[in-house]
């Protein structure tokens, strides 16, 4: 059963370096981290000392020229991808996270992404009180953007790509980085780097609702606010309110959502951001954040660079492509009830050497549990989606497309991935600016790579510096290989 936050948690706060620090009888996130750090440091020290020469795996020329796909060459603690069970967060599956991580206390609410962040950071599930206090801490940290960031965002062209706006906004916040300031002044030693990195990371994550809302108002409302920030609600409720997508007093409710639709949209945001926080370390946004951070760049610069990677069409634009595909397909078939028409359309796509967007996965060999979670969100609300032919087509394709892809014979994984459902659900509730989907993705993904950045500092990991090979170097390896075969 999902844990629920206990009401009336005793919370007091004080300001420190523009951050709000929350004290309660339970351990804070920082205190919980301090409890697990010695054991982790000892484990890494022992691993390097006793087994440092152990081979991890072979690297082939194909992998070097093929994007390093499959090379096991990064340390990443928060998540691991299982071909059978999907992504695991500190060893917990999505289903286990849904059952064990605390939510708001309201029946039917999804777990809070704040609880997931705690899990990623500490490796443990937060208690009711810890989750309540941490939710409040982040809400206080995020209550105001730096004035210079506000000024920068106000000056940007309103039609600038929203991901460019997000990267610029995050990079501008480097001016207030505790880590960068104290490192430059020589006030912190290597073993203490993690503390300011944690402060910066939490401040960055807490700022994302206001950053996101400001960017959305830029591209949809000439920069005029669509909602108000509140310290009394959770991270995702603030995101939704600032997008103008709730029907409370803190939001303009531009899509005229009912009370139930507003609650559902908030829970969709919690679900989406909760399950997109991390996906191992090899994807472009995570690896870029880690790479830039390994040079001791602060979290703002590091994650801003990760956002630039996420903006690339091969990484963060799949959900948009699925939405366009569903809309186009619906305009070319007479009814989703006609399965043969759907099959014929899919075969037409495949026979023209195109792919069916939203299907397949580089590692998974079963349906993506993240897709299953999004699909169940829709299935639990049949009345809400009964007249949305795009959502209905998404559900129908999940039954038909895998069979077609199996018959086609070229797909190792014919099942739907999370992008097959996520974008069209946002589209249903009123987010029609497709390029903005990736900004929401970027809000969620901050949690995983920044958690790893904190742990990179805790463990004192060095700058990343792999050796490169030119064409002649690769050819020389083939000659040596041929000699060894003789």
Swiss-Prot record:
<keyword id="KW-0816">Tricarboxylic acid cycle</keyword>
<feature type="active site">
    <location>
        <position position="419"/>
    </location>
</feature>
<dbReference type="GO" id="GO:0005975">
    <property type="term" value="P:carbohydrate metabolic process"/>
</dbReference>
<dbReference type="GO" id="GO:0019629">
    <property type="term" value="P:propionate catabolic process, 2-methylcitrate cycle"/>
</dbReference>
<feature type="transit peptide" description="Mitochondrion">
    <location>
        <begin position="1"/>
        <end position="23"/>
    </location>
</feature>
<dbReference type="Pfam" id="PF00285">
    <property type="entry name" value="Citrate_synt"/>
</dbReference>
<dbReference type="GO" id="GO:0050440">
    <property type="term" value="F:2-methylcitrate synthase activity"/>
</dbReference>
<comment type="pathway">
    <text>Carbohydrate metabolism; tricarboxylic acid cycle; isocitrate from oxaloacetate: step 1/2.</text>
</comment>
<dbReference type="InterPro" id="IPR036969">
    <property type="entry name" value="Citrate_synthase_sf"/>
</dbReference>
<protein>
    <recommendedName>
        <fullName>Citrate synthase 3, mitochondrial</fullName>
        <ecNumber>2.3.3.1</ecNumber>
    </recommendedName>
</protein>
<dbReference type="InterPro" id="IPR002020">
    <property type="entry name" value="Citrate_synthase"/>
</dbReference>
<dbReference type="GO" id="GO:0006099">
    <property type="term" value="P:tricarboxylic acid cycle"/>
</dbReference>
<feature type="active site">
    <location>
        <position position="315"/>
    </location>
</feature>
<keyword id="KW-0808">Transferase</keyword>
<dbReference type="InterPro" id="IPR016143">
    <property type="entry name" value="Citrate_synth-like_sm_a-sub"/>
</dbReference>
<keyword id="KW-0496">Mitochondrion</keyword>
<dbReference type="GO" id="GO:0004108">
    <property type="term" value="F:citrate (Si)-synthase activity"/>
</dbReference>
<dbReference type="GO" id="GO:0005739">
    <property type="term" value="C:mitochondrion"/>
</dbReference>
<comment type="function">
    <text>Dual specificity mitochondrial citrate and methylcitrate synthase with similar catalytic efficiency with both acetyl-CoA and propionyl-CoA.</text>
</comment>
<feature type="active site">
    <location>
        <position position="361"/>
    </location>
</feature>
<feature type="short sequence motif" description="Microbody targeting signal">
    <location>
        <begin position="484"/>
        <end position="486"/>
    </location>
</feature>
<dbReference type="GO" id="GO:0005759">
    <property type="term" value="C:mitochondrial matrix"/>
</dbReference>
<keyword id="KW-0809">Transit peptide</keyword>
<dbReference type="InterPro" id="IPR019810">
    <property type="entry name" value="Citrate_synthase_AS"/>
</dbReference>
<dbReference type="InterPro" id="IPR016142">
    <property type="entry name" value="Citrate_synth-like_lrg_a-sub"/>
</dbReference>
<comment type="similarity">
    <text>Belongs to the citrate synthase family.</text>
</comment>
């Amino acid at each position: 059963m999902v844990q629920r936050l206990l009401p009336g948690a005793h919370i007091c706060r004080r300001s420190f370096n523009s951050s709000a620090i929350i004290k309660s009888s339970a351990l804070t996130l920082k205190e919980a981290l301090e409890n697990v750090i010695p054991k982790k440091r000892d484990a890494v020290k022992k691993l390097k000392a006793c087994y440092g020469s152990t081979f991890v795996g072979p690297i082939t020329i194909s992998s070097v020229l093929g994007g390093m796909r499959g090379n096991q060459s990064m340390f990443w603690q928060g998540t691991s991808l299982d071909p059978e069970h999907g992504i695991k967060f500190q060893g917990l599956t999505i289903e286990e996270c849904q059952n064990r991580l605390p939510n708001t206390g309201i029946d039917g609410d999804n777990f809070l992404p704040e609880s997931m962040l705690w899990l990623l950071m500490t490796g443990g599930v937060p208690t009711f009180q810890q989750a309540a206090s941490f939710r409040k801490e982040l809400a206080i940290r995020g209550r105001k953007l730096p004035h210079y960031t506000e000024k920068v965002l106000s000056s940007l062209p309103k039609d600038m790509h929203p991901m460019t706006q997000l990267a610029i906004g995050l990079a501008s916040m480097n001016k207030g980085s505790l880590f960068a300031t104290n490192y430059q002044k020589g006030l912190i030693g290597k073993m203490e780097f993690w503390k300011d990195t944690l402060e910066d990371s939490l401040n960055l994550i807490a700022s994302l609702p206001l950053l996101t809302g400001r960017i959305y108002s830029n591209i949809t409302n000439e920069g005029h606010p669509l909602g108000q920030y509140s310290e009394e609600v959770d991270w995702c409720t603030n995101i939704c309110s600032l997008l103008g997508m709730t029907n409370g007093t803190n939001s303009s409710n531009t899509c005229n959502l009912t009370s139930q639709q507003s609650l559902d949209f908030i829970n969709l945001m919690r679900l989406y951001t909760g399950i997109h926080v991390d996906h191992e370390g090899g994807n472009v946004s995570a690896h870029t954040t880690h790479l830039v951070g390994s040079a001791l760049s602060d979290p703002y610069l590091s994650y801003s660079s990760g956002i630039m990677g996420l903006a690339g069409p091969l990484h963060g634009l799949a959900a948009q492509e699925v939405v366009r595909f569903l809309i186009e397909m619906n305009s070319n078939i007479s009814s989703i009830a006609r399965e043969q028409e759907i099959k014929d359309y899919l075969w037409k796509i495949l026979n023209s050497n195109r792919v069916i967007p939203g299907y397949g996965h580089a590692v998974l060999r079963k349906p993506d549990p993240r897709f299953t979670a999004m699909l169940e969100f829709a299935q639990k609300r049949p009345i809400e989606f009964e007249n949305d032919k795009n959502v209905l087509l998404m559900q129908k394709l999940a039954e038909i497309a895998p069979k077609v892809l199996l018959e086609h014979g070229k797909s190792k994984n014919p099942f739907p991935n999370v992008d097959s459902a996520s974008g069209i659900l946002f589209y249903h509730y009123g987010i029609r600016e497709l390029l903005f989907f990736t900004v929401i993705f970027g809000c969620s993904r901050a949690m995983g790579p920044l958690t790893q950045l904190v742990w990179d500092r805790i463990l004192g990991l060095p700058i990343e510096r792999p050796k490169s090979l030119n064409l002649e170097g690769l050819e020389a390896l083939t000659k040596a290989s041929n000699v060894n075969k003789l």
